[in-house]
Curated annotation (Swiss-Prot):
HAMAP family associated with the record: 16SrRNA_methyltr_G
Protein name: Ribosomal RNA small subunit methyltransferase G
Its EC number(s): 2.1.1.170
Source organism of this protein record: Bartonella bacilliformis (strain ATCC 35685 / KC583 / Herrer 020/F12,63)
Gene3D superfamilies the record matches: Vaccinia Virus protein VP39
GO MF annotations in UniProt: rRNA (guanine-N7-)-methyltransferase activity
């Protein structure tokens, strides 16, 4: 077990060289909570549980260094906490910053709040739909979403923020180019593509300065 944890720590350090032992311990605790709760509610696919560390935790961790200087994050459709809880753990180490989690499923909300309480994370969960969150929180610096909806739908949902100064970091799979092309039918935006460090077929789309083609 100790050897396995050290191996995981080295994998994390390869991505974020200055991660503390305490942060690593929080990530391991989060991993354990996912496995424990996943037996009762569907947080992640059962087929991916053996690859939880790489497929979900490291995949989420690569988001944070892109804008580690930012202090107000918001994750949409947080589900099992990827990437939101991982980002919250890094913000905890930084000792400043906050992330808001938006989730409509009550059971997943209960899980997320349990993790946040047990790990004492700088995060707040809002049990609501994305469309309703704009009345609850101020515009964040960064929006994240992982496997939530098509790019066109995400831009529609988040336009109230993205038309301002908010930046979106959206994790997408092999069909991302098609999603971008479809989105251009309705939107104009600045786009920067970051290749995933975990999956060669995946990317992180950095989107800003969104404008509607409909005026």
């Amino acid at each position: 077990m100790v050897v396995l944890v050290e191996q995981k720590y080295q994998e994390l350090l390869n991505m974020l060289p200055s991660v503390s032992r305490e942060t690593m311990e929080n990530l391991i605790q989060f991993e354990s909570l996912i496995i424990q709760w996943n037996a009762h509610i569907n947080l992640i696919s059962a087929a991916t549980v053996p690859f939880l560390w790489t497929r979900h935790i490291l995949d989420s961790a690569q988001i944070y260094p892109l804008y580690s200087q930012c202090l107000h994050w918001c994750d949409l459709g947080s589900g099992g906490g990827f990437p939101a809880i991982v980002i919250a753990i890094f913000l905890k180490e930084k000792q400043k910053g906050h992330i808001d989690l938006i989730e409509s499923n009550g059971k997943k909300v209960a899980f997320l709040r349990t993790v946040i309480a047990q790990l004492n994370l700088p995060a707040t969960v809002y049990h609501c739909r994305i469309e309703d969150v704009y009345q609850k929180i101020n515009a964040p610096e960064i929006i994240t979403a992982r496997g939530l909806a098509s790019l066109n739908t995400l831009l529609q949902l988040t336009f109230p923020w993205l038309k301002q100064k908010t930046i979106a970091l959206l994790q997408k799979g092999r069909d991302y180019a098609i999603e971008v092309e479809n989105a251009y039918a309705n939107w104009r935006f600045n786009l920067l593509k970051h290749q995933s460090k975990i999956d060669e077929n995946s990317v992180i789309l950095e989107i800003s300065h969104v404008r509607s083609c409909q005026g």
